[in-house]
Amino acid sequence: MLTGEKFAMQAVNGGYIGIPYEKLDCQGFVERVLADCGVRKPNGTVYDWRGSNSMYRNYYQWRGTVKECENKYGMIPQGALVFTRKTDGGEVERGYHDGLGNFSHVGIYVGAPHGVIHSTTGGVQFGKFPDAKRWTNVSLLSMIDYTNQNINNNDRDAKQIISEIRALLSKLEEVL
């Protein structure tokens, strides 16, 4: 399975930077990176969403606000999709009646030092993260493994760290 880190690295190193928006919009950019990573639907076809609203609502293992993601996982994992949510009621115009909001833009979080890669009117480029006015929501895709970044393992990791600290303290007591 594709890892979040490999997905992010493909976005950074795949030669997309500078491709004009007219050739690769924000949805198309994410789909292209997934396809270039070899990710396909169970029937063998590439993912073909109906815009960033559809991306936020489908094929996720977790979704929520940036703050909820940081609270739940301790960080935004590399390879997560980040979204711009508008509260203009646009989701109803686009056929959604679930109250989640209108997700008007999507990018791929790639981590420091680049932040986010997304396609805007200036083409595919790096964007600042965090940027509370632009990036409001996060989605972890179901076809990507984020566990390489210790996502979902925070409790186990904390217990392991405490155990290691206790072992080191015990050794220190022996020396003293």
Describe every region a protein language model picked out:
Residues 1-53, 63, 77, 85-104, ...:
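N-terminal capping segments
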Residues 153-176:
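Short, low-complexity, charged amphipathic interaction modules
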Residues 81-83, 108:
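Hydrophobic beta-strand signal
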